[in-house]
Amino acid sequence: MNSRSCICVSAMKPCCRFLISFRSSSLFGFSPPNSGKFINSSKLHCTKIDSRSIRSGIHCRRIVLDRNAFCDSDSISWGGGGSRVLRARGSSRGRGRGVLVIPHVASDFRNYSTSSLDSHVNDKSFESMFVKPLVFKEVEKTEGIPKRERGNVGGGKDANFGNVGVRKETERCLSQTEVEKEAWKLLRGAVVNYCGFPVGTVAANDPGDTQTLNYDQVFIRDFVPSAYAFMLDGEGEIVRNFLLHTLQLQSWEKTVDCHSPGPGLMPASFKVKSAPLEGNDGSFEEFLDPDFGGSAIGRVSPVDSGLWWIILLRAYGKLTGDYTLQERIDVQTGIKLILKLCLADGFDMFPTLLVTDGSCMVDRRMGIHGHPLEIQALFYSALRCAREMLIVNDGTKSLVTAVNNRLSALSFHIREYYWVDIKKINEIYRYNTEEYSADATNKFNIYPEQIPTWLVDWIPDKGGYFIGNLQPAHMDFRFFTLGNLWAVISSLGNQEQNEGVMTLIEEKWDDLVANMPLKICFPALEKDEWRIITGSDPKNTPWSYHNGGSWPTLLWQFTLACIKMGKLELAKKAVAVAEKRLKEDEWPEYYDTKSGRFVGKQSRLYQTWTIAGFLAAKKLIEQPEKASLLFWEEDYQLLETCVCGLSKSSGRKNKCSRFTPPRS
């Protein structure tokens, strides 16, 4: 039997400093040999690295005469230590893009040397991280050793789920509808492999699409519903791989027009590419090509990517029981870098994040620049996730304190100033303006004339919602679904406000759900508003795309919010509406018209997060007990640091919208 060789090159590309003890580290899942058979240990030492002078990434090189290969696991000896080396052999199936030569892409930093870490444990600068730059090259040929195929997403056999058993495929299929069966087939067909291991799902996988644009990439926000669907189905490997690979991409040098953003920025997307190796016929290497917004329409920075990454990291631990991932030094450092970027001091007087238009799911010009609700809700959720996962020590105490302070201030700000119901709108209608005082009622100098005519008749007597944006002399009264749902899921709103959001959706079902759940925002910008605010965007015409279009991917978030608020039947109703049409309409990205009757005029078909959103919603309905792992209840400890609690006025705290005592 002819054996083929594999070459793997792993070159870390950090933006800060990393430290790993060589003697006890288990980088890539094995202990390095004492002998110099494969590695020159003299070159493996701790060093400070300037990110501006390094441009390297994780590459997986394979030498294969044909490109049909799948992963084999062979046990060989590395200087006396056991290890697995995956070699190219045989043929691949599905969307396999490569052969993984090293079982785990990122290192297991938890097996570090205590002595090596002691000198850095008291480092007060939480942005500091330490890494040992490594380049591993291995060429080995072995035969007759038992092999095991890896990288399959479907059976869940390789998922790291502890004592949680994986359901048999036959039992699972018996309980699935035809729509679900097709959805699972499509979702698994959208999986992208890197070096033989699944690392994500493409944005869309329409076989009839001749112009893929960037829909053949793995987007962080798009992959989140796919990750939830896989984990709820007992498959965690793809999520773990995704989290680790995107973490490595975080450290890449990011430059657009000679300017580099902060090192904590996560990419909007990445793509697996391959390039031929010089001097080797038939051999090539795979590499990840990230996009940090430099190729996006409008060149917008993906602010929400890092927030989604932290949220997904927590969900991975909750659903799989594998908390070792979030405890790793490299992962802990990734969390800190994102937090540093979000908590950086600036000119803003508010605890909300100031962003440009198009920096989240609404990624085109839609008048959401400033402090959009979607970003604030995800920011709050990410802060709560990070606070749970951060390992508290002398080096992180100041960061944890900053997180707690921001959580308290942010929840107060959103609950107090973003919330509207019939009572609040009537209050705004009677506002005095031009108030110059620290105790002013109309703190943002909102003119009553800003209340739109549609809102006066639309707002129900019961219920309410969080407005889309707030800035001086400006309130965006549009209802943005994703932001309101995450306000409920994360308990950014208090109990009454969360109930009010769900009541409003139920009351305004014909506007927000109708023929296809759910409206991304309501109402649409029309006529002069559309021309001025969107710049006459031909894709965001009224009741289309982000301007009032209906997006089925929001189903899973709606289902999670419904389960939290005890409205499971409402979620089932919405899923049933979608299930009637999605398969027939070929899983479109979005729907047009006020009631969501038409498939979007520029909608991609077989959109992965449409498929995954539907499947995740179905799984949550089947397993509502798991939903409790994914949402948050009110944190009453935050109320102790409320600014109202610091007031000398004893009665002021009772009036604070953040304070809603727990129900008996």
Swiss-Prot record:
GO molecular function, one term: endo-alpha-N-acetylgalactosaminidase activity
Gene3D superfamilies: 1.50.10.10
pH dependence (record): Optimum pH is 6.0.
CC terms in the record's Gene Ontology section: mitochondrion
Keyword Transit peptide: yes
Protein name as catalogued: Alkaline/neutral invertase C, mitochondrial
Disruption outcome: Delayed germination time, reduced plant growth, delayed flowering and reduced oxygen consumption in the dark.
InterPro entries reported for this sequence: 6-hairpin_glycosidase_sf (IPR008928), 6hp_glycosidase-like_sf (IPR012341), Glyco_hydro_100 (IPR024746)
Tissue specificity annotation: Expressed in seedlings, roots and flowers.
Hydrolase listed as a keyword: yes
Catalytic activity: Hydrolysis of terminal non-reducing beta-D-fructofuranoside residues in beta-D-fructofuranosides
Source species of the chain: Arabidopsis thaliana
